From Swiss-Prot:
UniProt name for this protein: Acetylglutamate kinase
Residues holding substrate: 68-69, 90, 195
GO CC, any one term: cytoplasm
Gene Ontology molecular functions: acetylglutamate kinase activity; ATP binding
UniProt keyword annotation of ATP-binding present: yes
Keywords from the UniProt entry: Amino-acid biosynthesis, Arginine biosynthesis, ATP-binding, Cytoplasm, Kinase, Nucleotide-binding, Transferase
InterPro entries: AceGlu_kinase-like_sf, AcgluKinase_fam, ArgB, Asp/Glu/Uridylate_kinase, Glu/AcGlu_kinase, NAGK-C
Pfam families (UniProt xref): AA_kinase
Subcellular location: Cytoplasm
Pathway: Amino-acid biosynthesis; L-arginine biosynthesis; N(2)-acetyl-L-ornithine from L-glutamate: step 2/4
SUPFAM superfamilies: Carbamate kinase-like (SSF53633)
Gene: argB
Length: 301
């Protein structure tokens, strides 16, 4: 058999093996949080766009929520606006909020939409202000030390939390064969803008849509135990135990809580995926191996 025929046979074999997975997810909604290295490498960006288009082509409904922290930081630096963080959250005054909206809604969102469309998709770019897609309120942050009798309220500006999601809009787009691409900017009751963590927005969108999967692309191989081994499958009960014993801590804690809450809120499963791996999304959907950690509501044996 020639090399060309070998390659063709391998391609046919892969497609054939993917058939049961395609059948499983046809008509289902998958929410993907896009960020990290997958947004920076040209090769990975192209691969992501092709993966999203392929999902839609075989009848799966992807909904993309993206971040953009590094891009925001870059523009703030160029504008000589200093960045400040509290507990990992960007302090967002009115001037910074203008930059956040400009970068997320005007640059990053449209770049992703354009890339997907160039590869044959029909992506629509949105922020939370469009048809009040993401209704939000100001996030209250408190801090307390042993010396304090009452917690101190810390004002971090236009940082918000999700109050509600306009599922009518998203369902309309999905049924029209469009791919929604969402920037994590929320709108308040009086029209004010809020900067919201993209993981949290993705989780709330997945809950509201009762998605089959929430997929969070990261720069790590997955959730690891204390010895550094990747934990490929966990129940919600096991995740709670890993948080309690300190295995999950620091910067991973908010991401894992988001994944956990999504499953508890009705999402089929949440996945922490290594976005540095080419075609990571397809590997998770169409194979049993995967490239990260799956969190589901299954009972522990």
């Amino acid at each position: 058999m020639t090399i060309e025929r070998d390659a063709a046979a391998n391609t046919a074999k892969v497609l054939s093996e993917a058939l049961p997975y395609i059948r499983r997810y046809v008509g289902k909604t998958l929410v993907i949080k896009y960020g990290g290295n997958a947004m920076e490498s040209e090769e990975l960006k192209t691969g992501f766009a092709r993966d999203i288009v392929l999902m839609k082509a075989v009848g799966i409904n992807p909904v993309v929520v993206h971040g953009g922290g590094p891009q925001i930081g870059d523009l703030l630096k160029r504008l000589s606006i200093e960045s400040h963080f509290v507990d990992g959250m960007r302090v967002t005054d009115a001037q910074t909020m203008d930059v956040v909206e400009m970068v997320l809604g005007g640059q990053v969102n449209k770049d992703i939409v354009n890339l997907i469309n160039r590869h044959g998709g029909s992506a629509i770019g949105l922020t939370g202000k469009d048809a009040e897609l993401i209704r939000a309120k100001k996030l209250t942050v408190t801090r307390q030390t042993p010396e304090m009798t009452t917690p101190e309220i810390i004002d971090i500006g236009h940082v918000g939390e999700v109050v509600g999601i306009n599922t009518d809009l998203l369902n309309l787009l999905v049924k029209g064969d469009f791919i929604p691409v969402i920037a994590p900017i929320g709108v308040g009751a009086n029209g004010e803008s809020y900067n919201i963590n993209a993981d949290l927005v993705a989780g709330k969108v997945a809950e509201a849509l009762k998605a089959e999967k929430l997929m969070l692309l990261t720069n790590i191989a997955g959730l690891m135990d204390k010895s550094g081994k990747v934990l490929t499958g966990l129940s919600t009960q096991q995740v709670d135990e890993l948080i309690a014993d300190g295995t999950i801590y620091g910067g991973m804690l908010p991401k894992i809580r988001c994944a956990l809450e999504a499953v508890q809120g009705g999402v089929g499963s949440s996945l922490i995926i290594d976005g540095r791996v080419p075609n990571a999304i397809l590997l998770e959907i169409f194979t049993d191996t995967g490239v990260g950690t799956l969190i589901s509501n299954r009972k522990r044996p």
